[in-house]
Amino acid sequence: MLTRLSLVLLCLVTNMLMAQQATVTQLLSKDLTNLPNKEGLMITVEYAPGGSDPIHRHNAHAFVYVLEGSVVMQVKGGKEITLTPGQSFYEGPADVHVVSRNASNVKPAKFVVLFVKDKGAPVLAPAR
């Protein structure tokens, strides 16, 4: 009986964690011919209620613009801020993004990110 209950709880927790992961959609990728070896990448990020991302960095310039809901952002050494639709946020190439989450546990959140990054480089880099 205890094993069956443990299995049920494990399944529930796994489903909850999977539901909270961000959905990322690529909108555009473009070589920036006036900036040698650089490209622009535009994505949308959608957080389910209570959703968040782990600590990360981008090794790129990242310009964030909130479309729906509210998101909480913080880079290492900076203050935690809550952004609402129409507000923006910037991350530099050396910034470690320590907080990135939906501010709500009941409403989804969505934002656009424009990256200026090294051509062919991955969007995410390990946090240092």
PLM regions with names:
Residues 36-37, 57, 65, 82, ...:
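Extracellular/periplasmic catalytic domains that process cell-envelope and extracellular macromolecules
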Residues 32-34, 47, 77-94:
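Short acidic-glycine-tyrosine-enriched beta hairpin
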Residues 58-77, 87:
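Glycine- and acidic-residue-biased ligand/ion/polar-headgroup-sensing regions
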Residues 37-42, 61, 78, 94, ...:
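Extracytoplasmic
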Residues 80, 95-120:
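Ligand-binding loop in jelly-roll beta-barrel domains
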Residues 52-54, 72, 89, 93-102:
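Histidine-centered metal-chelating micro-motifs
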Residues 2-11, 15-41, 74, 89-90, ...:
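A short, N-terminal "cap"/entry segment at the start of jelly-roll beta-barrel domains
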Residues 28-61:
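N-terminal targeting signals for Sec/Tat export/insertion, comprising classic cleavable signal peptides
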